[in-house]
UniProtKB/Swiss-Prot annotation:
Motif ('KMSKS' region): 554-558
GN (gene name): valS
Location of the protein in the cell: Cytoplasm
Motif ('HIGH' region): 42-52
GO molecular-function term, one example from the UniProt record: valine-tRNA ligase activity
Name used for this protein in its record: Valine--tRNA ligase
Length: 951
């Protein structure tokens, strides 16, 4: 084997070999249980980020683990067309390169441009997924806009429409005036900001007066520009100031519209003035109030968020109406919405109707992609009736057909599902699945899989002109069908029969509503088992937390704290990293801060660590459902682990290749160490499998690390040396056999988490075991064997380890050279301790560097010694002649003085009231912890001084 482990040399060629050999495909053995995971489809034009790497590592670990258990295993791969995101990228690209908009291109040509861009950059993410070692079946790769999936989308739309579960309605939606499309509630980001509350007088009509004799109402509003669309004023029916005015009218300033005063709980007597203007076409709460009181709706805004030249007036059901004039005063027409706000306030003030302006804290909705303020807008949209679909989806989780890991996410799911709103599925975009609905010139709507079907079903002749709906479906509509559409539905395919319901869904909690809930609803509606019972899309949902930076901040381009997973695999120089973090930024003014921070954190760029080290780190950090603070130190630690495994394997191979390892017969004697490591490994298998079976990847990674580093490398390889240096033929055969057996099993155990290094080493080790199989990927996963439990070997070896560690600690504390042979005395031995010494003298002498071991009679005090207590015995190391008493006492006095200095420094700090008042709790706790540590160290040194002074 190569002297040093270099992941760059082995990982890519190995992956290409695996893929070429078809090892990632299902084995097709239907007598075995199936196991299937659907990858959450990443955006086709995106690139891999830490969240992807994290989730995909967890998925690949599960898939490899199940595949090695002989299951018929499919990891279904694919990408998402990502409507808004992709369209925005391409629009920005043509604007920057050609100075054009999508409208310059026209719909068809612009869509062609997006397909071109997909062909160009769509391969980035799949290339990166290969670098992570993902064992997905590439031959089954799907794309949400491929022909099969597009057919499934049409099928679902048509069927839901025919069942009256999809309808078209005029409703208020979140409108992004920059992107000119409806967006969902989940894509709205609410930001806190400082604003104003304007108090405006609305004159009462017909000589009416308030209880205190005023001839106007004062209405408080944060959005004076929408006054132009008011159709009512609400007061609380219990409010003594105004309740007698309910049913009377006010005259709306600026437009002189006569609008009613309605009694509604929405008006809060304690808030503002108690009178609320109602603009049903421009506010979600007002929309509901308007419905309750049958108020008309007046839309005053264009889709760009400017004031219209003439308003659109609708009745409460959304039909056009002439109940009010559509005129808008000329001075406000075509004004941008925030300019209109200033103009309306100035005009009201000029009329003497502006009573006061108060500062006010606001929550303002922004679009998370367009980045501008969202406008509630009255538009025609397509909706799915969600309550009907939600009922069985709630029951599936209640009765345990679907389980969430961790369980607390079930509550989040229930709270949303039990209060579910109809889902707006239409988007005013060009990129996506176009809605399969057509209109004739009279405005009648026809839904079908294609235009021919529509004409045939509705007996429409060639002379009837039809135009297809311009809108596309929300991206999440096609994603909701992912578990079954990818397997060939609506055809009844073998894949659907074998792999659905799927086994586990790995997802971030941030898309539990966007995606998880909708998959459950859609799947249960369309997929039934042979008895007609709705099928769930998956049995388990494993929720991951978010990956944050080392300070717990969310990773984002504007913070400049994003780490590309592949930069940790392959390494990146500082100049390249700076370019990546500060090049073409949306907010260039942040570049300097980001540059400084990056230079401080990565003065030499990022070293290459290899894929296995990255995967091991991600698995080790995967404590269920919690957010993870990324830690470069952990990554270095797991790269060191890979080096350690490599070097240990080289040691094993150097001692076994070309030797008799007992696989072809011959007498074998197992030493205590051999029996111990076999028993220890058997227990490790049991604990490791339990951790993986319960989705505790962090615990599994910890078990693997502990066994490999501490038990196998640090102890067992040391414990083999006495046999290797002077054992009989049978003992040598036994130890070589054990070395090879445990290493080969350990490689299989570790393979799901660190696939590359394990396959590479295994190819060398398999020869020694007489294994002829081609790949570790398809080897059986290690099984716990209850008959191999060896309590005696475990107990005896633990005792020997205690004794060796005790001697090593005495050397360290007394400053004795590691190579100097020592005399060991044992006092007060139990029968077990004496037996253990007598049976394992050679081991003890070699590993603890002892020249002699003597068991003292019970009453023998022995010479002046340093002592340690272990289980069933007291260990003594005589000190005479080992150290220079004066020098050692002087050294210890120096150490004590140094520690006392640190103690008084911290005590002064903690006694400083200013420091304690100002410093964060965590900083104070850390100082107290340091103080305790120093106090313990001082006590130990004083103990050593006493021992040496007594010599």
């Amino acid at each position: 084997m190569e002297k040093t482990y270099n992941p760059q040399d082995i990982e890519q060629p190995l992956y290409e070999h695996w893929e070429k050999q078809g090892y990632f495909k299902p084995n097709g053995d239907e007598s075995q249980e199936s196991f299937c995971i659907m990858i959450p489809p990443p955006n086709v034009t995106g690139s891999l980020h830490m969240g992807h790497a994290f989730q995909q590592t967890i998925m690949d670990t599960m898939i490899r683990y199940q595949r090695m258990q002989g299951k018929n295993t499919l990891w279904q791969v694919g990408t998402d067309h990502a409507g808004i995101a992709t369209q925005m990228v391409v629009e920005r690209k043509i604007a920057a390169e050609e100075g054009k908009t999508r409208h310059d291109y026209g719909r068809e040509a612009f869509i062609d441009k997006i397909w071109e861009w997909k062909a160009e950059s769509g391969g980035t993410i799949t290339r990166q997924m290969r670098r992570l070692g993902n064992s997905v079946d590439w031959e089954r790769e799907r794309f949400t806009m491929d022909e099969g999936l597009s057919n499934a989308v049409k099928e679902v739309f048509v069927r839901l429409y025919k069942e009256d579960l999809i309808y078209r309605g005029k409703r208020l939606v979140n409108w992004d005036p920059k992107l000119r499309t409806a967006i969902s509630d989940l894509e709205v980001e609410n930001r806190e900001s400082k604003g104003s509350m304007w108090h405006i007088r609305y004159p009462l009509a017909d000589g009416a007066k308030t209880a205190d004799g005023k001839d106007y109402l004062v209405v408080a509003t944060t959005r004076p520009e929408t006054l132009l669309g008011d159709t009512g004023v609400a007061v609380n029916p219990e409010d003594p100031r105004y309740k007698d005015l309910i049913g009377k009218y006010v005259i709306l300033p600026l437009v002189n519209r006569r609008i009613p005063i309605v009694g509604d709980e929405h008006a809060d007597m304690e808030k503002g003035t108690g009178c609320v203007k109602i603009t049903p076409a421009h506010d979600f709460n007002d929309y509901e109030v308007g419905k309750r009181h049958a108020l008309p709706m007046i839309n005053i805004l264009t889709f760009d968020g400017d004031i219209r030249e003439s308003a659109q007036v609708f009745d409460t059901k959304g039909n056009e109406s002439d109940v009010y004039s559509s005129e808008i005063p000329a001075e406000f027409q075509k004004l941008e919405r925030f300019a209109a706000r200033k103009a309306v306030v100035a005009a009201v003030d000029a009329l003497g109707l502006l009573e006061e302006i108060k500062p006010h804290d606001l929550t303002v909705p922004y679009g998370d992609r367009g980045g501008v303020v969202i406008e509630p807008m009255l538009t025609d949209q397509w909706y799915v009736r969600a309550d009907v679909l939600a009922k069985p989806a709630v029951e599936a989780v209640e009765n345990g057909d679907i389980q969430f890991v961790p369980k607390q996410y079930e509550n989040m799911y229930f709270s949303w599902m039990r209060d579910i709103q109809d889902w707006c599925i239409s988007r005013q975009l060009w990129w996506g699945h176009r809605i399969p609905a057509w209109y004739d010139e009279a405005g009648n709507v026809y839904v079908g899989r294609n235009e021919d079907e529509v004409r045939k079903e509705n007996n429409l002749g060639a002379d009837v002109v039809l135009r297809q709906d311009e809108d596309v479906l929300d991206t999440w509509f096609s994603s909701a069908l992912w578990t079954f559409s990818t397997l060939g539905w609506p055809e009844n395919t073998d894949a659907l029969r074998q792999f659905h319901p799927t086994s586990v869904m790995v997802s971030g909690f941030d898309i539990i509503f966007f995606w998880i809930a909708r998959m459950i609803m859609m799947t249960m509606h369309f997929i039934k088992d042979e008895n007609g019972k709705p099928q769930v899309p998956f049995h388990t949902v494993y929720m991951t937390g978010l990956i944050r930076d080392d300070e717990g901040q969310k990773m984002s381009k504007s913070k400049g704290n994003v780490i590309d997973p592949l930069d940790m695999v392959d390494g990146i120089s500082l100049p390249e990293l700076l370019e990546k973090r500060t090049g073409n930024m949306m907010q260039p003014q942040l570049a300097d801060k980001i540059r400084k921070r990056t230079e401080k954190q990565f003065p030499n760029g990022i070293e290459p660590h290899g894929t296995d080290a990255l995967r091991f780190t991600l698995a080790a950090l995967a404590s269920t459902g919690r957010d993870i603070n990324w830690d470069m130190k952990r990554l270095e630690g797991y790269r060191n682990f890979c080096n350690k495994l490599w070097n240990a394997s080289r040691f094993v191979l150097m001692n076994t290749e070309g030797q008799d390892c007992g696989f072809n017969g011959g007498e074998m004697t197992l030493s205590l160490a051999d029996r111990w490591i076999l028993a220890e490994f058997n227990q490790t298998i049991k604990a490791y499998r339990e951790a993986l079976d319960s989705f505790r990847f962090d615990i599994a990674a910890g078990i693997l690390y502990e066994f490999t580093w501490n038990q196998f490398c640090d102890w067992y390889l040391e414990l083999t040396k006495p046999v290797m240096n002077g054992g009989t033929e049978a003992e040598l055969r036994g130890t070589r056999h054990t070395l090879v057996t445990v290493l080969e099993g350990l490689l299989r155990l570790a393979h799901p988490i660190i696939p590359f290094i394990t396959e590479t080493i295994w190819q060398r080790v398999k020869v020694l075991c007489g294994i002829t199989a081609d790949t570790i990927m398809l080897q059986p996963f290690p099984q716990y064997d209850a008959s191999q439990v060896d309590e005696a070997a475990l107990a005896d070896t633990e005792w020997l380890k205690q004794a060796i560690v005790a001697v090593r600690n005495i050397r360290a504390e007394m400053n004795i050279a590691p190579g100097k042979p020592l005399e060991l005395l044992l006092r007060g031995c139990s029968a077990d301790a004496e037996r253990r010494v007598n049976e394992n003298r050679g081991f003890l002498q070699t590993l603890a560097r002892l020249e002699s071991i003597t068991v003292l009679p019970a009453d023998d005090k022995g010479p002046v010694s340093v002592t340690k207590i272990i289980d069933g015995a007291e260990l003594l190391i005589p000190m005479a002649g080992l150290i220079n008493k004066e020098d050692e006492l002087a050294r210890l006095a120096k150490e004590v003085a140094k520690i006392e200095g640190e103690i008084s420094r911290i005590e002064n700090k903690l006694a400083n009231e200013g420091f304690v008042a100002r410093a964060p709790e965590a900083v104070i706790a850390k100082e107290r912890e340091k103080l305790e540590g120093y106090a313990e160290a001082k006590a130990k040194l004083i103990e050593q001084q006493a021992v040496i002074a007594a010599l």
